[in-house]
Amino acid sequence: MMAAKPVREIIKYADGTVKARGSRLNGEMHGAWSFFRLDGSLMRSGRFDRGRQVGVWKTFTRDGALVKDTDFGA
């Protein structure tokens, strides 16, 4: 049996602007993900391990300044 491979996914707002970008493995968020505001600015980025947030997630202001790091552990 072949191992499942991550599938890239782009989620968009109704107007077509990218809302989120990342990969899914067996239907679950897996690997690096980035989430964007409706204005296109990066809001948050981090990693998932089979649907669970892991490691350090970064949250940004609209102008790109780092607001906080949130550590979800391994």
Report each predicted region and the residues it spans:
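Glycine/tyrosine- and acidic-biased, solvent-exposed loop/turn segments at the edges of beta-strands
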Residues: M1-A74
